[in-house]
């Protein structure tokens, strides 16, 4: 019963967000959307708005702009639960969005191929069409994303000791102006658990 009520609330929330936020913002082009993509589009529809517009679209009061207010919606994506948040932030400076997905893969070449697809699918739903660049915390450099380089990282972790890992970021660049400023990124964290490769993906967007 509790799960049923939660599902109904999530559906109502998605409908509210789609009506209040998505209108007036063009969605990504392409074929038919999955229900997950439709929910995500409703949330991302708030990102192109100013803080004042977002507060109105989210049904918030003017005095709520000073804090973090908004909605968090859990829904299934690719067999995983993703937590997506749309809210005003930093004293009403803009709209903040965050999404996360996590999954464990086999510690093998087949596993690394599946991880590449997992990363690219996650990235594509936020920026379509999209291009990504890779940031590494150690090098402090920015370079064009190369799927072969990602595979090299994954194989290094797979061949390492249990507990070893790697973490890096993709900045989002593309025609979708809601997701094209420098503050947008997807972070990839891969850890060798000994039993497999645990991959955690997160997306963050701030529209100021």
Show which residues each predicted segment covers:
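A glycine-biased structural micro-motif
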Residues: 45-49
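Long, charged/polar, surface-exposed segments that mediate recognition or autoinhibition
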Residues: 77-168
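Extracytoplasmic/secreted envelope proteins and their assembly/folding machinery
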Residues: 40, 51-58, 112-119, 123
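C-terminal motif of bacterial Sec signal peptides marking the signal peptidase cleavage site
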Residues: 16-20
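Bacterial signal peptide processing site
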Residues: 22-25
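Short, recurring structural edge motifs at helix starts
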Residues: 37-44, 106-109
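An acidic-aromatic pocket/loop used at catalytic or ligand-binding sites
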Residues: 59, 101-106, 144, 148-208
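Positively charged n-region of N-terminal signal peptides that target proteins for export
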Residues: 1-7
């Amino acid at each position: 019963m509790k799960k049923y009520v939660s599902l109904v609330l999530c559906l109502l929330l998605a409908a509210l967000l789609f009506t209040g936020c998505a209108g007036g913002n063009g969605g990504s082009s392409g074929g038919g959307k999955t229900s997950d993509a439709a929910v995500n589009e409703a949330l991302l529809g708030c990102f192109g708005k100013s803080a004042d517009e977002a507060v109105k679209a989210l049904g918030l009061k003017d005095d709520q702009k000073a804090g973090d207010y908004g909605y968090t919606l859990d829904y299934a994506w690719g067999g995983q639960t993703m937590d997506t948040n749309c809210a005003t932030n930093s004293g009403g400076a803009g709209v903040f969005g965050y999404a996360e997905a996590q999954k464990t893969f086999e510690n093998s070449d087949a596993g690394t191929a599946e991880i590449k697809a997992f990363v690219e699918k996650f990235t594509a739903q936020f920026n379509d069409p999209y291009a990504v660049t890779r940031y590494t915390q150690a090098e402090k450099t920015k370079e064009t994303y190369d799927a072969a380089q990602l595979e090299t990282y994954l194989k290094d972790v797979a061949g390492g000791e249990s507990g070893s890992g790697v973490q890096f970021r993709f900045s989002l660049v593309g025609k979708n102006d809601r997701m094209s400023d420098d503050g947008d990124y997807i972070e990839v964290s891969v850890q060798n658990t000994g039993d497999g490769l645990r991959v955690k993906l997160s997306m963050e967007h701030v529209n100021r």
